[in-house]
Amino acid sequence: MKHTAKHLAVLAVTVIIFASWAEAAVIEVNSGESIQAAVNLANPGDTISVQSGVFRESLNMTKPIALEGIDRPQIDAGAMGSGITLFADGSRITGFDIRTTRRTGIYVISDNNIIENNTISSCLDGIRLDRAQANQIAANDINNNTNGIFLYASNANTIAHNNIRDNNINEESDCGIALAYSGDNIIQYNDLTDNGDSSLSLRSSENNTLRGNIISNNDWYGISLSESSNKNLIEMNNAVGNKDAGIYLDSSRENTIRENIASDNSRGIYLSFDSNDNILQNNNVSSNGKGIHLANHSSNNTLENNTARKNGYGIYLTFSAGWNLIFSNHLIDNGHNAYDRGQSNRWDNGEAGNYYSDLGRVFYVPGGAGVDSYPMTEPEL
């Protein structure tokens, strides 16, 4: 009995050692060889090291492995399909130049993958996540696709430190990063420029964090939320030089928009079509046609401690924007510091109003019946 137990213990140790060796295996693929053949031979946990060259194939990853490019090998799927499809959880893709004309550069239908330091171009979607969770997408250069990164029904992913530009090859629909029916994602510290309709678009997506992104020179919006994209946090982004709004909400509620910079847009921050119960706080909007614009039944929003400087209008409310609370804002050197054609908007909270560089003792807001009974005589520092 003791001999049998000892034999089983030795066998268990041997199995662990061989499993460890298998996890550490590295398979090298040279120019002219097949990456897919190496994937088929690999065991879970293996690393496939691909040397420089052009590989004309569409890869299917059906097991968790690391695929590493040396000196930026190119995967060109042509009309065959997506460049790489991740079916298995827990893979890592790094160091590739990925191109395809018909489909997606990297198509993810699995969880807990890492996609980093790749160049992806000339695709329908550069990277697409479809019902995929907890993936990390970082430090990629994604350019000249229809959409840079597209998430569909995908939650708890992190997209950070990517350079996403010129994703506008299809004029009907083009975005830098687009989310649909997706929640609890973190999108932060990306550089997005010249991405067609919008650099960062959320549709029917809730509880996402958009933080510290630099967004510029889009045909319509820098950041856009639509179709009940509710309860998102938009903070510390810089939206510059977009043809319409730096930040745009359409039919979206209970979002927090704070500490953003929006400058040189047609509108800095624009709420429209029943975008209600949002908080706009500590934003800096300057050199826009309208700094902050509320329209089309956008109601019950709170605008607090924002600075609007050198815009055509600092804060502009159209006739159907009502029951908004506006206080402790700094409206400085705008063509019109404030304009209110709405109804029942409050320009103070009963204790503090706003600072206007064209101050009167009681500030009657042009456009309608708006009155600030407690205007500040000096801006808060």
Residue ranges and their predicted role:
Residues 31, 52, 64-106:
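Right-handed parallel beta-helix/beta-spiral solenoid domain characteristic of secreted/periplasmic
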Residues 46-49, 74, 299, 304, ...:
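Acidic, glycine- and Ser/Thr-rich low-complexity intrinsically disordered tracts
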Residues 77-85, 100-110, 122-132, 144-154, ...:
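Extracellular beta-strand/beta-solenoid scaffold signature
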Residues 25-56:
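Acidic Gly/Asp/Thr-rich repetitive segments characteristic of extracellular carbohydrate-active
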Residues 1-9:
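Bacterial N-terminal signal peptides that target proteins for export
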Residues 20-24:
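Sec/Tat signal peptide C-region and signal peptidase I cleavage site
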Residues 10-19:
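Bacterial N-terminal signal peptides
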